[in-house]
Amino acid sequence: NNNEDSIKIGRGYISMFQQSLANKNWAEAYMNWKWIFKNAPFAVNGTYTQGPLMFYYLITTEKDEAKKLAYFNEMMSIFEARTKNLDALNSFAKTKSTMGDVLASKAEFYNWTAPNVKNSGYTLNKSYDNYKQAITTINEKGGREIEGSVLQTFFMISDAMYKANAKADSKANPFRTHYLQDY
C-alpha cells in the first residue's frame, strides 16, 4: 500500500532527524528536516521547535556567506509557517504554544543569528520590533511566562536604541517615550 509506505518513509525521516539532533550532526539533521518540512509539515512539532536550533548551529559553523544567508532565510520561514499553522500544530501537541511564545522565539533566533549573516537585513530597529511584538502579544493574548533572557535582551536592545538616538538634549530623543514605556 502506497500510504503505508509513505508513512514508513516519513517515520524514518523523523527518526533520523531526531537522532541527528541528539548526535549534534547538524548537516544530517538538516537533510532530514528539509524532507519533513516539505513533505510532512504536520508530522512532528520538532520540525518547528527544534529546527531553529539546528539552523543556529548550521549558521554559526558555516563559512560560506551565501549558505549562511540561505540557512537564515529557511530558519525565518519556519517561524512564518509556524505562526500561519499554529492552531493545526497545537491540535496534536502535548504542550500548546501561543503566538507570543512563537514570536519570542523568533525574536531570539533573529537576534542571535542575523547580525552574523551578510545581507540578512539585520537592524537594531528590527530586532527591537521583534521583541516588542512578542512581549506585547504575550501581555495582550497570553502565553507562557516571558523568559528572563527575552526580557534582558529586549531591555539591552531598547537601551542601545535609546543611546543610538541620543542628542545633547535628552528630551529631544525621538526614542525617549518608547524607552520609558519599555521600563
Which role fits each region the language model picked out?
Residues 1-183:
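Preference for long, solvent-exposed alpha-helical segments and helix-linker "stalks"
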